[in-house]
Amino acid sequence: EPFPPRYLHRFSDLLEEDSLSLIQAWPKISPLRRVALLEDLDELNQADDLLSFEEVCKLAIKDSQAQVLLLGVKILKEYELPQYISDFIHLAKHDSDGAVRAAAAGALGAFTYLGEVDKLHPSTHQRIEDALLSILNSQDESIVRRRALEALGYSSREEVNPAIELAYASGDPDWLISALNAMGNSADSKWKSKVIVMFDHQHPLVRAEAASAAGEIEIISAVPSLLRMLDDVDLDVRMAVMWS
């Protein structure tokens, strides 16, 4: 049975006494109800950025259930709170579930960006980059390593550009999409020609990612091509073009 919708807002900005009550109650809530609660909170969180379900997510990212962990990471990353960087690094490197590791690696992207614009302590920034590079160069599942590459797109570390080039030239559409995502995250015009040439790729998700990257990099010369892509047969491509 789901939590009554009218009570869901009460999970936002919990007072200390309410947080303590939640900590005591959490183990008694069935895994299915925990997932249902977090799905509802995620929906609310997306609709209203004034809400904060940090206290619930703090429990969720310590949970034993992969889906609970996944939703906890998804919501918590939106708040960009540096105190959870260590948790995200630990999950990205050590959680037993690949989807959780991938989500946590992706969550580190925002902090990589914050470090680049001097809003994190340099040692913290380096720790994040080191963790992501370690994941990228590991034998982990492709999805986890690809999320690490995308997060590293924000980084100016010298190891990053060769890694993007390698993924771009891999011939694997998934790695190509991640390379384009990283290029967009870098906002570096050096990637301009490599992005534009992918507007005509046979794979629609590649075309969509290339369109998004063109917007991130602000490639003015790509505008005529992007306008033509508004007639693309694929909805994802058209949506990406409209965003760009």
Sequence positions of predicted segments:
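Alpha-solenoid HEAT/ARM repeat scaffold
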Residues: P5, V35, E39, L70-L71, ...
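Residues within HEAT/ARM-like alpha-solenoid scaffolds
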Residues: R6, I29-L32, A36, D48, ...
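Amphipathic alpha-helical repeat scaffolds
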Residues: L8-H9, I23-P27, L38-D42, C57-K58, ...
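Amphipathic alpha-helical scaffolding segments comprising HEAT/armadillo-like alpha-solenoid repeats
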Residues: L14-W26, A47-K62, L81-K93, L114-N137, ...
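Alpha-helix N-cap/helix-start positions at coil->helix boundaries
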Residues: P31-V35, A66-Q67, P82, G98-A99, ...
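Hydrophobic residues within the alpha-helices of tandem HEAT/HEAT-like
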Residues: L37, L41, A107-Y113, S155-R157
